[in-house]
Amino acid sequence: HSDAVFTDSYTRLLKQMAMRKYLDSILN
């Protein structure tokens, strides 16, 4: 299913963004 692939990649993208914000908050 393309939906499953999209959801998986979207979830991964959100995790990357969240991780980046988390690291930024620690470093700054």
UniProtKB/Swiss-Prot annotation:
Its main location: secreted. It comes from the Eukaryota. GO terms for biological process: adenylate cyclase-activating G protein-coupled receptor signaling pathway. The keyword Secreted applies. One of its GO terms (molecular function) is type 1 vasoactive intestinal polypeptide receptor binding. Gene3D superfamilies: 6.10.250.590. PROSITE patterns: GLUCAGON. Keywords: Amidation, Hormone, Secreted. Pfam families: Hormone_2. One of its GO terms (cellular component) is extracellular region. InterPro entries: Glucagon_GIP_secretin_VIP. The keyword Secreted applies. The modification Asparagine amide is found at N28. It is found in: Secreted. Belongs to the glucagon family. This is Vasoactive intestinal peptide. It comes from Didelphis virginiana (North American opossum).
